[in-house]
């Protein structure tokens, strides 16, 4: 809380369950969260509801419903800390009930905000004493860049269609960028040789990404540009990032925080 308040973020509390449509439309129909991991139920009013699997969609819904975009000074800076639920195979570091801390900035397209959010994550991890902090960043570009890159990916992956897992086969036409997030070992060599989105950004997207990097340099944040990062949710554009750190008992670098812009 102290770090967020230093950056003038205010706490927001959202419901533990929301209308299922919020996550289907907001998080993305092709995301693993929606297709495999949500806890869905029908309430007594015959409404389809979902236990929240992540925090962003509920915050954005609250921003719109409460008209925070109206007379309030922009951007609106919020942070949350709450329980999330995902139906996935329990394993080390992954539980079906988890606590997620996050920050959201709404009402600004300034690349400085991207760097600020990354800086908050790094400062929180430093404050709690984590070592070996590593920041990986990438740009997914604007819609024009992603549409062009989508065509390139379909052309690249099509010859390998019979070698890919079933999930990737389904993603090829719907959202080929999601193929790059595949965790199946047999697909890894195909992914490594795939075209990189950073080579297909248009001038505006490339310039924006360069500005984010300059802001990170000014904030003295060490980072690596990693074109393989696409994140697992469908709403991201432009900057995406992952923050790794050493965690006692795990013995290796672990991704503890991640996020990105969603214009």
Language-model features, listed with the residues they occupy:
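TRNA-recognition modules of translation machinery and tRNA-sensing kinases, especially anticodon-binding
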Residues: 1-263
